[in-house]
């Protein structure tokens, strides 16, 4: 692990001022800086502007070199607001890329893109730092073992199981439940999985970041009494940050996760909410740098930027990084270049459907659109594979019959098709589940359902043993035993009403 001079906070004062330049131009978050001949910084070097503005307020802005323009000028993107900067101010070249604290000192803390703590819990030990720009592991270091990562969420474990050490995408438009699903996964996995997690909040709502932090403190994932016992490090670059910070905050979180994998040899969970905002920030920066836009106005380097981030998220012989990424889908269009580029890197996709959310079925995971490379008999076993395929067949047949039902009604269907529709509606409701993190909204306690129990439940519905139970008995329950108990309660209530 390379240890670099820190590029923010008090460490800057110790930097040699041998390479310093002057601000020549400021356009929003983009600075042009002139350096003396022969003293030009490298691409991705961190530059620091320190001084006072006209009102006497202290300024400390870190930028990253993006372009060498010629005539001894470079173009850099600021990682924080450029308010108060003026032409002619001194700019110091740190001689290295942005570096952030890594290791056990990061657990239980909240950082910004520069690796500075923003939780007001005092300074962080910065003796071990790592540059945010690194190359992906070599082929020979990669690990290719295939094993299932149980989440306790029925629809995920049965129909689109996650791979341990794989990359998973949660696709959905605005307000269909991506962040709630990520928070539930953090809750379930942090309790069941002993390793550490890193959460990268990239360009999302500050309120959600705060809610997540409070929830983690309540559940004990962050230990307030003994911060070192915490299981998670949080890195936030939220919606109000300049595009430079939103573009790089994902790399800051990834760098912290890589240290746990490579040096501590741990299995790490990396949550990114939202990978689309990383692309969006890259698009803003690209436009500010004057590059010609590509399809739908995205940056021409979209695939390269996505690849350089995603290829570092992988499993090596030392340890693994299992990554769960929320992907906002603009206007619910999965063919948009941002989600379409992300698809190529994933082992499993969990697609959230607005139609299911409108029906009140949560998690609103589309069972027919969601995919996984792990759903193969040699990996999950014959029983799991066959149950999943039969569930999908039943739901697909129901989907095909919906036009006929809406025009002619259920009575026009054959006896067999009516039975299929009844079972499909039960399956659809049984795929819903109460979440621990949504207890305040639903009023029902969260449920973690093991894989074996999930398979047993769906096999019972498919076999026809539960054909006599009402549909609503299967809605928002955990195991199949809860559904039968709920059916008995519903029957008692209807008897009492009579």
Swiss-Prot record:
ATP binds at residues 172-179. Its EC number is 7.1.2.2. SMART domains: AAA. Keywords: ATP synthesis, ATP-binding, CF(1), Chloroplast, Hydrogen ion transport, Ion transport, Membrane, Nucleotide-binding, Plastid, Thylakoid, Translocase, Transport. GO terms for molecular function: ATP binding; ATP hydrolysis activity; proton-transporting ATP synthase activity, rotational mechanism. The keyword Repeat does not apply. It is found in: Plastid, Chloroplast thylakoid membrane. GO terms for biological process: proton motive force-driven mitochondrial ATP synthesis. It is a peripheral membrane protein. Gene3D superfamilies: 2.40.10.170, Bovine Mitochondrial F1-atpase, Atp Synthase Beta Chain, Chain D, domain 3, P-loop containing nucleotide triphosphate hydrolases. It is an enzyme of class 7 (translocase). One of its GO terms (cellular component) is chloroplast thylakoid membrane. InterPro entries: AAA+_ATPase, ATP-synt_VA_C, ATP_synth_F1_bsu, ATPase_a/bsu_AS, ATPase_alpha/beta_chains, ATPase_F1/V1/A1_a/bsu_N, ATPase_F1/V1/A1_a/bsu_N_sf, ATPase_F1/V1/A1_a/bsu_nucl-bd. The keyword Nucleotidyltransferase does not apply. It comes from the Eukaryota. HAMAP family: ATP_synth_beta_bact. Produces ATP from ADP in the presence of a proton gradient across the membrane. The catalytic sites are hosted primarily by the beta subunits. Belongs to the ATPase alpha/beta chains family. F-type ATPases have 2 components, CF(1) - the catalytic core - and CF(0) - the membrane proton channel. CF(1) has five subunits: alpha(3), beta(3), gamma(1), delta(1), epsilon(1). CF(0) has four main subunits: a(1), b(1), b'(1) and c(9-12). This is ATP synthase subunit beta, chloroplastic. The gene is atpB.
